[in-house]
Amino acid sequence: MAPAPTSVPLVSQPNVISDLKTALAVQGSASDHPRTLHQLLSQAAERYPLQQLGFISSSAHDSSIQTKSYSTFNQHVRNLARALTDWKKPVGSIVVVYLTEHEDNMAAVWACLLAGYIPCLQPALSAQQSHKEGHINHIKNLFLSATWLTNEIGAEQVMSVDGIDIHLFSDLKLAAEGYNVPADWAAVEAKPDDEAILFLTSGSTGFSKAVVHTHRTIIASCYAKGQSYGLTSETNVLNWVGFDHVAGSLEMHITPLLFGSYQLHVHASTILSDPLSFLRLIDDKSINIAFAPNFLLAKLARDLEKRSELYGAFDLSSVKRINSGGEAVVSKTAKIFVTVLKALAKDPSKVSFVVSAGFGMTETCAGCIYDPIDLSVINPMHEFLDLGRPIQGCEMRIVDPEDGITLRPDGESGELQVRGPMVFARYYNNPQATSSSFVEGRWYRTGDIGIIEKGVMRLSGRIKDTVIVHGVSYGIPELETYLQLVEGVTHSFLAAAPYRAPGQETEGFVVFYSPTFDLNEEDASNKLAATHRALRDISVKMITLPPQQIIPIPIDQMEKTTLGKLSRARLLTLFKQGELAKHIARADELLSEARGATFVVPATITETAFAKIFAGVFNLSTDDISAADNFFELGGTSIDVIRLKREGETVFGLPEIPIIQILKHPVLRDLAKYIDALVSKDNTQQEYDPIVPLQLTGNKTPIFFVHPGVGEVLIFVNLAKYFQNERPFYAFRARGFEPGQPFFSKMDEMVSSYAAAMKRTQPKGPYAIAGYSYGGVIAFEVAKRLEAGGDEVKFVGLINIPPHIADRMHEIDWTGGMLNLSYFLGLVSKQDADDLAPTLRPLTRKEQLDVVWKLSPPERLVELQLTPEKLDHWVDIAGSLIECGKDYNPSGSVAVADVFYAIPLRGSKSDWLNNQLKPWSGFSRTEPAFTDVPGRHYTLMDFDHVPQFQKIFRSRLEARGV
């Protein structure tokens, strides 16, 4: 007989009982507890005046920490609040806070609260103009007002929408300098059930909803969480989640503020660009509690597992708890992570911490269910870590998802529902959504499918239409809308469903569709291959991930509901149960047939050897590799190029296979021919050709990219793959890398060479060209040259480069050029490059290179296959390009220009845009488009930023009709 179904209340967690008692003793009696956020801030400043808030901003290249004491911060935000009241807005007015840095967001939110306003935290706006403007208008209509507090860059993004009342945070700070209010000043006295902070949902299934959290819901959540964590004034907390997320603001700021803990808030770019900094900060600041989602656990485990030279390098004895959320945590990954951290520790015996997977939502003030376990002694029972038991005051239950009421027995899956004082009050100005989110008893319907066994919860799926990739939620309906447009897909007979294969680190998805053609007709194999290729390409471009499986199902076997919809849940169930195996087998048969039509069996010894290398890189069978395969079309990245180079050198006993030759010979048989010639010494000096074809598929206008000031093109490899089956992607490489090649001595010579090569490659226009950094002015000059010859240039992309560069070129001496190159290559940090310059200048050239060489990470030198001699020569190439730019004075104009801007090397982004980049307007016959892109000058195309950059860049190509 099945046990009686019950809801699950709070269950005490034995491993935190002692810390809980300490926390409660520190906080005092219940009568001392603050009832509003105003009281909470006052209490923190009074009880812990010297405790610190630390911040590492996005522009802190050296990861330097700026600090404010609780007392100083309290005074700062109250002065800001007093300045805010000068806006003369009614009490209860909503202010959309749209800022980048933790410190600014934090101060703005508290200032709004103390001024009697309601802050609404706005995450990063979409790069798609129509989607961004649609969202801003939606927010304006939802709040019946449109007051935004932002910075200069945010104002640029928002001002395209009419009727927005924009205030700059810099102006507010300036105004606040004129006030010095009492330490307990507030414009209004808040009540526990007043609206406190609004958080926007992801909008993954439509426009965002605004989640209303009151003072009561926030404080209830923070108390329960702090007690669960065992927080005290001796605890050190590390946060890198954005402040616009409930985890960043409520869980990792207000919660430790309540308990008087030290807080270090780090901009996400610092951790994501260098995951090792996560461990350095734990070591340097004796961090006790930190957050690491599954993808970061996986990345750290994968990157550091083989880094034996780092073993024993970090003091990790302080860390006691690593929270993880946002996506399911793979048990195996978490175990490896713990093992690796112990190996990296100076004294592994002193490292003892729990990894706590958790469940939470915007609607629950972030985490409300946790399962802290010591993975060094406990082996998880399931593929993913359990999510555990509720915090104090929270209840959970599993019910029938159809009626939302009928309880499911212990161990049986169903819809997860939660309730408690930390659950949100309502959706702002949306009673219908609020009503549909709750059932009788104020149980909140999470939309997740879970199982509770012996009081411990784990998730098994989701009702909601989203797929999570590395913690980022993407809307399935939006993806389906674009996939429906693919030729070969029957309209309204396509569905995509989130799916995580056994052992997979992150979530993926499966596409089900009915083809417009009969799978038994004569040309079905080629049609199917083309359809699947298009479905993969669109998926990668929209959500950075291809489908795990694409399943064609005849239309007469694709059942719809009575409302005419496909059931994703039903299709996914059929897939998991093997009911679609015959359709998968038929598709595989046809795709193999299509591939067989173009399959070329590797014939020579060299081709066979490369087939083995290709197979190893892409985890394929050697029999599946064709001599006609293109390395990049198989999915090769810039890192894969390095691996191919190394393995090729080992197999063929060659001292070096130049990377450029791999880029120029990406097809297996062509690369084999080149190697045969190299081995036989029959590799005669080839005439310099600046064009490097990085991808050749697609029928749209080709795009040509000009190298940055280092002269190389490897940085474009990861970008080029996003253009597969859309348009060819060519890159220009500077002269001088190959033996015997002279450097360019004049810019005009370079422009003439590139323009001629462009015409040879694409004899007729219209043309599209872009240049990154220094390459931007070259692209501008090449476009002018083409237009002067009567050709149409429909796109000129100028990426983070001003028109006037001569002064900057004259500033760069040999030492500066060498350090710039070293920073660009990841050999030294930006701070090291700046600090070393005066020290190195008196030294000889060789001595300077020796210093940089010793500072360079050994693994990076191996990855780049650098030697001191190669680095020295590369510095000369970069120096020759600098010399070409010293006399450059822009003149003339092009028909159109698109300027892309990121965080500059020096100064603020707004100054960079307004004073350095806006002058491009004088060199375009139509007003240029200025487009903000994520990242810094040297990182905007790196692995972390290229998925967003390609979307933005391709949208501008589309806008220009290219």
From Swiss-Prot:
SUPFAM superfamilies: Acetyl-CoA synthetase-like, ACP-like, alpha/beta-Hydrolases. The keyword Phosphoprotein applies. It comes from Serpula lacrymans var. lacrymans (strain S7.9). Residues 606-676 are annotated as: Thiolation and peptide carrier (T) domain. This is Atromentin synthetase nps3. Belongs to the ATP-dependent AMP-binding enzyme family. Induction: Up-regulated upon coincubation of the fungus with the terrestrial bacteria Streptomyces iranensis, Bacillus subtilis or Pseudomonas putida. Residues 702-805 are annotated as: Thioesterase (TE) domain. Pathway: Secondary metabolite biosynthesis. The gene is nps3.
